[in-house]
């Protein structure tokens, strides 16, 4: 599993492109779910595929946070935002931090970048091993196949003052594979206008199958129909109290 070229090329513009995302609302909802379903008593939170650290920044006042991401570029930005926080480069299929957490999260459909079910099972096992007894796993999956709009197109504009970004996208589907084709126009003072293209490939896994994989990893699992993004839902899986 490689870090996406998009994150290497566009890490510096990532927060601008997602400026409309309500991280505060997302985080508040995640905390409510973690408190409702979690059975451990601590306050340690691991965010896998933490990106630039926006969720961790909001969790930090209440939790002792750690982040893992595959992208050096995204981690560099996260370190600027979160001085003193442990941020580790790692692959979600294989990392081992040597410690356990009360909450493990994998958000913003990062799990969808795993191309095979075997990879998904490996990642779920890694998540489970990092949970304390009674700890809770929160996974925001890629979109449920039944909600996917084939041929869907979008256009968004983002004004960062001296930097302006237009992003257009289209979606193609082949079996369980979703390809999201992005075109970026980046207008930046002193650098002119650049056009970048990138295709992101994500695997669709039916919610019922995600629950089965989490249970096979030894967790008690369910899929909530509403999550940080409603049509994606939220996998909630709890480790047994004694292991």
Located regions from the model:
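Class I SAM-dependent methyltransferase SAM/SAH-binding core
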Residues: 46, 53-94
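SAM-dependent methyltransferase
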Residues: 138-209
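A short glycine-rich, Lys/Arg-flanked "PGG" loop and its adjoining helix->strand segment in the class I
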Residues: 121-133
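A short acidic, Gly/Pro-enriched loop at the edge of an enzyme's catalytic core
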Residues: 93-103
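Conserved class I S-adenosyl-L-methionine
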Residues: 41-49
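A short SAM/SAH-binding and catalytic strip from SAM-dependent methyltransferases
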Residues: 102-118
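C-terminal lobe and adjacent flexible extensions of AdoMet/dcAdoMet transferase-like proteins
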Residues: 203-243
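Conserved alpha-helix/loop element of class I SAM-dependent methyltransferases that forms part
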Residues: 24-41
């Amino acid at each position: 599993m490689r870090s996406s070229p998009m994150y290497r090329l566009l890490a510096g513009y990532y927060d601008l492109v997602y400026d409309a995302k309500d991280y505060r609302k997302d985080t508040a909802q995640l905390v409510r779910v973690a408190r409702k379903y979690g059975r451990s008593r601590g306050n340690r939170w691991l965010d896998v595929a933490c990106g630039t650290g926006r969720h961790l920044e909001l969790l930090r006042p209440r939790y002792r946070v750690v982040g893992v991401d595959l992208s050096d570029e995204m981690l560099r930005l996260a370190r600027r935002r979160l001085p003193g926080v442990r941020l580790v480069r790692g692959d979600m299929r294989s990392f081992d931090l040597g410690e356990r957490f009360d909450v493990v999260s994998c958000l913003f459909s990062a799990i969808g970048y795993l191309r095979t079910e075997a990879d998904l099972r490996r990642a779920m096992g890694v998540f489970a091993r990092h949970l304390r007894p009674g700890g809770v796993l929160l996974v925001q999956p890629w979109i449920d196949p039944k909600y996917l709009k084939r041929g869907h197109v979008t256009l968004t504009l983002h004004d960062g003052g001296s930097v302006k970004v237009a992003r257009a996208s289209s979606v193609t589907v082949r079996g369980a594979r979703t390809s999201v084709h992005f075109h970026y126009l980046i207008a930046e003072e002193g650098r002119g206008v650049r056009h970048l293209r990138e295709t992101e490939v994500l695997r669709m896994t039916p919610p019922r199958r995600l629950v089965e994989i989490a249970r096979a990893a030894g967790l008690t699992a369910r899929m909530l129909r509403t999550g940080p993004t409603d049509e994606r839902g939220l996998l909630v899986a709890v480790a047994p109290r004694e292991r």
